[in-house]
């Protein structure tokens, strides 16, 4: 087959249009390039296609689908299908610097007798041979099965589901949300259990990977696995770390079982970074390069649409999903646009700096986007799927309050603007989903947290970690004091797991699914407690509670231990960097 000259002609035409308009449309370029490349699947081995070579008949050193398959960002008529070719996943992937065609199929049945969509996508070295197929033309609220093929190799089969049509009457949905899965701190048994649930969707709220070198961040119950490299800095580093996490069988099973909607927190790049401001010990210029590498690796390993393709150190990740008329999900990015943490970060008393009315956590554009979505929503529930503690959370005393400068408490003016907007629209159906803090919490959301008699406009469900922090316990040494100082907080638990939510038009039920340990595989899972919120001003109501067998009843840990552990990890990193410089 002769080389198809339309590719070069199309690229030249796009360049001319871009120069004339003084703009460059990345999305148009990528979509167009994919279409033109698709014309060339019959090329001979290693024949050139534009700027890259295509290996149309690949032979692999070992099985290329080592990282499994995933789906995500579902809409009512489409879903993203993901995989990455990586026969040697922990050493850069083990692929040649050639593009490889990957066939994909979507079927109504798991035996692929009723195939409804199929095509070919190019796995390119520029994106670590990852594939992001936006499979469209699908029916609303339907289960589908998908798979990939390249050369003579066939991927595992994944199962996914489209969203109901916008505005459709939906009687119920069930989903889970998870966060914080430090690989060294434990085994991903929670995902083994999650994969067996009957779910429509999974949300991941951040800290999908951790950036630390081996045994820099150590849990109270000890590290039981080891990171595969020193602190990650470069694109290759981040790719290998994602691959290590993605190689876990339980995580792969959960990805293959349901569509996921993901957002990041800080450890996908580094601890507590704010916008383009890093931790101490590195320049802004070096950090911007690091952030760009981290963002690209994140995109390469997540089932995201091309609208989220990074542009250097920037990436569009906040987005909106509607589940019929039942729920409107606003997936936030509280990391990329925020002002620097006040008071030099950490857990501190409030100050003039933290109270500055101009401080932002979301950035102006995202804040306005959120208000537009909340203001126009006609859904039964308005959801903020995000990273950090939203409710006021004093873990000091009334006389000497202490707040996390990294959470919404460090940006009270931003929280007040959100609450004031909710108040102006007279909403009482707001649910905030949160990760980050490695423990389970449940809070009533008041228009004024200082007055528990003030209107309740919603509830916050904070999910515990998958592994981060180690085994945990039923309660901590500071639990009773925190609950006393924060009467709007109704529940705390420190075991590991995830949250399962069952939603109907009139009721939101959250089940806290936890395990007694993660430092060994095989832990059983139980529902520690279930809470219901019903939009009737009575707030959260506990409807069940269970004692977890086989775990620690109370630990000597307190909230600030998590902050101290990260500080110790950073100190270890700085010692290594100083030693490297002096040597």
Swiss-Prot record:
Record keywords, A-Z: Hydrolase, Signal, Stress response
Region (Disordered): 339-359
PTM annotation, UniProt: Predicted to be exported by the Tat system. The position of the signal peptide cleavage has been experimentally proven.
SUPFAM superfamilies reported for this sequence: Metallo-dependent phosphatases (SSF56300)
Highest taxon listed in the record's lineage: Bacteria
InterPro entries documented for this protein: Metallo-depent_PP-like, PhoD-like_MPP, PhoD-like_sf, PhoD_N, Phospholipid_Metab_Enz
GO MF term set: alkaline phosphatase activity
Substrates-to-products reaction catalysed: a phosphate monoester + H2O = an alcohol + phosphate
Presence of keyword Signal: yes
Skewed-composition ranges (Basic and acidic residues): 350-359
The EC number(s) this enzyme carries: 3.1.3.1
Reported induction: By phosphate starvation.
Tagged with keyword Cell membrane: no
Enzyme class: hydrolase
Residues in the signal sequence: 1-56
Protein family membership: Belongs to the PhoD family.
Protein name: Alkaline phosphatase D
């Amino acid at each position: 087959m002769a080389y198809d000259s339309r590719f070069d002609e199309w690229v030249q035409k796009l360049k001319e249009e871009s120069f004339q308009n003084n703009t460059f449309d990345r999305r148009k370029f990528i979509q167009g390039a994919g279409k033109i490349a698709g014309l060339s699947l019959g090329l001979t081995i290693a024949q050139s296609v534009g700027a890259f070579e295509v290996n149309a008949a690949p032979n692999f050193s070992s099985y290329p689908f080592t990282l499994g398959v995933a789906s995500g960002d579902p809409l009512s008529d489409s879903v993203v299908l993901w995989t990455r070719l990586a026969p040697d996943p922990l050493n850069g992937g083990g692929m040649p610097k050639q593009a490889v065609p990957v066939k994909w199929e979507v079927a109504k049945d798991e035996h692929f007798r009723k195939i409804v969509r199929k095509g070919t996508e190019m796995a390119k070295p520029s994106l670590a041979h990852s594939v992001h197929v936006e499979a469209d033309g699908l029916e609303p609220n339907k289960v589908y099965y998908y798979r990939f093929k390249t050369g003579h190799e066939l991927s595992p089969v994944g199962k996914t589901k489209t969203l109901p049509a916008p505005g459709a009457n939906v009687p119920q949905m069930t989903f889970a949300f998870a966060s914080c899965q430090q690989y060294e701190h434990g085994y991903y048994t929670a995902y083994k259990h999650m994969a067996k649930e009957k779910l429509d969707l999974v949300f991941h709220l951040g800290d999908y990977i951790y950036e630390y070198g081996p045994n820099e961040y150590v849990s109270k119950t000890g590290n039981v696995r080891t990171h595969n490299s020193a602190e990650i800095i470069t694109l290759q580093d981040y790719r290998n770390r994602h691959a290590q996490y993605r190689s876990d069988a339980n995580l792969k099973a959960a990805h293959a079982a349901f569509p996921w909607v993901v957002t990041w927190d800080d450890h996908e790049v580094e601890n507590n970074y704010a916008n383009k401001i890093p931790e101490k010990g590195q320049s802004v210029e070096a950090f911007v390069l690091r952030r760009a590498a981290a963002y690209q690796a994140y995109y390469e390993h997540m089932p995201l649409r091309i609208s989220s393709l990074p542009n250097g150190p920037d990436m569009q990740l906040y987005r909106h999903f509607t589940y019929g008329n039942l729920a409107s999900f606003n997936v936030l990015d509280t990391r990329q646009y925020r002002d620097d943490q006040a008071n030099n970060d950490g857990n501190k008393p409030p100050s003039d700096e933290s109270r500055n009315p101009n401080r932002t956590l979301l950035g102006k554009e995202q804040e306005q986007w959120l208000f537009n979505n909340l203001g126009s929503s006609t859904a039964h529930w308005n959801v903020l799927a995000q990273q950090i503690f939203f409710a006021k959370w004093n873990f000091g005393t009334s006389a000497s309050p202490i707040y996390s400068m990294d959470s919404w408490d460090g940006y009270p003016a931003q929280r007040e603007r959100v609450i004031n907007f909710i108040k102006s629209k007279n909403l009482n159906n707001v649910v905030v989903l949160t990760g980050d803090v490695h423990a389970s919490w449940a809070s009533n959301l008041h228009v004024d947290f200082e007055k528990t008699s003030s209107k309740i406009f919603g509830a916050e469900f904070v999910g515990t970690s998958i592994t981060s922090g180690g085994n945990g316990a039923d309660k901590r040494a500071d639990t009773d004091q925190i609950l006393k100082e924060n009467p709007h907080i109704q529940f705390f638990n420190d075991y590991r797991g995830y949250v399962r939510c069952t939603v109907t038009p009139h009721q939101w039920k959250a089940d806290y699914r936890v395990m007694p340990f993660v430092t060994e595989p095989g832990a059983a899972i139980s529902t520690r407690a279930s809470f219901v919120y019903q939009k009737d001003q009575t707030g959260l109501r506990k409807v069940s509670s269970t004692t977890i067998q086989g775990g620690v009843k109370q630990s000597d840990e307190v909230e600030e231990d998590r902050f101290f552990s990260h500080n110790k990890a950073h100190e270890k990193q700085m010692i290594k960097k100083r030693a490297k410089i002096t040597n």
